[in-house]
């Protein structure tokens, strides 16, 4: 969907339900290189997505907790392109539902490369050195409101935009981070050599090898 936003001189392609109506693995990969945009008090804050993780409820062992929560399970099984703000270790994490209705799935936005409004982001992060290289950090840097949960994209103050496609050779595919179940599934995507990813591929692979006893 191409729309005019007041912060653009030319039309941009804003991601909507059609983009997210695919499997979580497809959406997680396609989101690499896209932009996250937040308008805060008239200022545009933005970042290029450099890291994502896919979660597919029915066949994903890591989703054992949300299966017990009827509200979350219903949200993940509903229409694609809807915000799901997951809370972990007292921090909010940004997820977007995907796949067809009835197929519980989402994609976690793990890291961004800032492209606009960096000074304001640093204020929101209270001067922290690590700005958006982690799922909780980017939520804080963009002042994403947990009250937005269950609302469809795009919102007036928050949306995603298509970006330049990132070639396959520049995208790494690894296991996900910090899981106790489903940790062997290669459902994480990250831009190779990006200083903004939350964990280097070497660290992730080393951790996976140790947990496997290799």
UniProtKB/Swiss-Prot annotation:
CDD domains documented for this protein: AAG
Organism: Gloeobacter violaceus (strain ATCC 29082 / PCC 7421)
Gene3D superfamilies per the UniProt record, alphabetical: Methylpurine-DNA glycosylase (MPG) (3.10.300.10)
Similarity annotation: Belongs to the DNA glycosylase MPG family.
Keywords in alphabetical order: DNA damage, DNA repair, Hydrolase
Broad enzyme group: hydrolase
InterPro entries assigned: Formyl_transferase-like_C_sf (IPR011034), MPG (IPR003180), MPG_sf (IPR036995)
Catalytic activity, EC: 3.2.2.-
Name of the protein in question: Putative 3-methyladenine DNA glycosylase
An individual GO BP term: base-excision repair
Molecular function GO labels: alkylbase DNA N-glycosylase activity; DNA binding
Keyword check for Lipid metabolism: no
Keyword check for DNA repair: yes
């Amino acid at each position: 969907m191409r729309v005019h936003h007041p912060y653009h001189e030319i039309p941009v392609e804003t991601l909507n339900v059609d983009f997210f109506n695919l499997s979580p693995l497809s959406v997680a990969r396609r989101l690499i290189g896209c932009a996250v945009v937040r308008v805060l008090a008239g200022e545009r804050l933005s970042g290029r997505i450099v890291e994502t993780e896919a979660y597919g409820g029915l066949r994903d062992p890591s989703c054992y907790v949300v299966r017990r929560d009827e509200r979350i399970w219903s949200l993940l099984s509903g229409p694609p392109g809807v915000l799901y703000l997951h809370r972990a270790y007292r921090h909010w994490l940004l997820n977007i539902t995907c796949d067809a209705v009835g197929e519980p799935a989402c994609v976690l936005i793990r890291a961004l490369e800032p492209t606009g409004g960096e000074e304001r982001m640093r204020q929101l992060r209270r001067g922290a050195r690590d700005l958006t290289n982690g799922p909780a950090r980017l939520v804080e840097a963009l002042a994403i409101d947990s009250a937005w949960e269950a609302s469809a994209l795009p919102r007036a103050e928050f949306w995603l935009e298509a970006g330049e496609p990132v070639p396959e050779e520049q995208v790494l595919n690894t296991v996900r981070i910090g899981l106790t179940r489903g940790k062997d599934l290669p459902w994480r995507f990250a831009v190779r050599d990006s200083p903004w990813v939350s964990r280097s591929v070497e660290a992730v692979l080393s951790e996976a090898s140790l947990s496997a006893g290799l």
